[in-house]
Amino acid sequence: NLPDKVDITVFLQGDMPSGFKKLAGSTEELLQEFRELGKANIQYRFSKPGAGMEDTAKLYFLDSLARMGIKPYTIQVQVKEGEGNDERQVIPGALISYSGRATAINLLSGQQSAVMNEAVINSTEALLEYKFANAIQKITADTVPLIGYLLGNGETLSENVRSLIDGTLRSNYRFSFLPID
């Protein structure tokens, strides 16, 4: 149940290898299901990042996406049989906007390369629903949950706990240390 419109822009459009086209098709199917469930409050579109922008604006836009976690992948595509390969950039990500806030989803996060073999496609497709639902839940939440960690008795913060806090918890929760001394 969404109180306002959620706008989703997916950056999977244009001339791409078949693995990315399959990912785009799966993403569109999922977003169509979300639209049906969310009534008129889910809107989505597919676009080629920076299309129609001047070079400077396009570089600024791509830099903004990279800072949000959507990084371009440079891939080799065969132009025509016997003519060799051409390098292209593909940005497998989405930008979700809601009430003046925005968040980004890297559809290939967790993947080591942009080589779209069957295993990578299946893994990426399996995580699509979670990634979009999680991002929509985060961006539409009114408050961010708070976690407190008790410190005291001369104990130091272990590297495992520090890694957990920085790597996982800070992206989803507010975090505070509570001294018990």
Language-model region placement:
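Short, surface-exposed patches at the edges or C-terminal ends of soluble domains, predominantly
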Residues: N1-D181
